[in-house]
């Protein structure tokens, strides 16, 4: 059975145990920081998609020749037809849905807002983890100072 997180009195731990706690917290902080970067890149991708939708549906772009990506390195020539006003929207893992320009804009706005919220939550978790690391480091410093003082007085 999995047990929930238990509160541990850090002052009761040895310096070696505190060092292990810091290693664990550093590992968690690194994971959170990596996730933060990935979410930021995803949000940037959706913002670019939103800007591309807004650019594509401008009246002056009707009939404009464009390159349509088939893969990351293969493009074919195409022509914008605003009379159709349907766009293929990448919804992830290689799936596309046909949407109107307004629906595509709303989709990408929602994605950006969701990612902004997730990034904010992750940033709060990173801040909390940093505070925990500093608290453990302070206790380690106090214990090291106390150990040094006890050794000198002996």
From Swiss-Prot:
One of its GO terms (molecular function) is unfolded protein binding. It comes from the Eukaryota. GO terms for cellular component: cell division site; cell tip; cytoplasm; cytosol; nucleus; prefoldin complex. Keywords: Chaperone, Cytoplasm. The keyword Cytoplasm applies. The keyword Cytoplasm applies. Heterohexamer of two PFD-alpha type and four PFD-beta type subunits. Interacts with byr1. Binds specifically to cytosolic chaperonin (c-CPN) and transfers target proteins to it. Binds to nascent polypeptide chain and promotes folding in an environment in which there are many competing pathways for nonnative proteins. Required for normal cytoskeletal function and when bound to byr1, is involved in the regulation of sexual differentiation. Belongs to the prefoldin subunit alpha family. This is Probable prefoldin subunit 5.
């Amino acid at each position: 059975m999995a047990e929930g997180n238990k509160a541990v009195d850090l002052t009761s731990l040895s310096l070696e145990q505190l060092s292990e706690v810091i290693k664990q917290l550093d590992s968690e902080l690194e994971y959170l920081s990596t996730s933060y970067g990935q979410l930021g890149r995803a949000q940037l991708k959706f913002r670019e998609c939103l800007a591309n939708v807004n650019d594509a549906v401008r009246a002056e772009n009707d009939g404009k020749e464009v390159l349509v990506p088939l893969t990351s390195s293969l493009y074919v020539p195409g022509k914008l037809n605003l009379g159709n006003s349907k766009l293929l929207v990448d919804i992830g893992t290689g799936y596309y849905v046909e949407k109107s320009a307004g629906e595509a804009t709303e989709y990408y706005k929602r994605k950006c807002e969701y990612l902004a919220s997730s990034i904010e939550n992750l940033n709060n978790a990173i801040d909390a983890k940093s505070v925990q690391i500093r608290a453990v480091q302070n206790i380690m410093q106090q214990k090291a100072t106390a150990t040094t003082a006890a050794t000198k007085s002996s």
